[in-house]
């Protein structure tokens, strides 16, 4: 389990570092992630993050696809760059999957993104398909990171941690 090794390195680091992990939990339950470090069958394998270090653990509340859903304009930028045309004039943000929804609460954002891309974009009579390795890098480039930080509480917390002044 890669995250367990990352946690061990985080704990053993001599300088203050942050740890950004997938929580796969709703925002209100993010601290339940620490329970994954408890090993009831082999208690000696339990990992304990000291209380003073827990504030330096940051959670990816959702899959990164939630970021794209938070900023649907990045889909338009991607489509234009990749030669896709928009099938309908409806604003993507008005689609029932997104309208009036807290993106951090949407279940399986990668699946929702696939639906949105297939519904809205076409090239050579073929609907757009989302693939994490093929499509995500271009979509990441199209994000407005500054605006995204204000839409994602954990990302903002991480940004402030990374950009805090270093004591001299």
Where are these regions (language model features)?
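C-terminal accessory helical subdomains adjacent to catalytic cores in phosphodiester-
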Residues: 3-18, 23-168
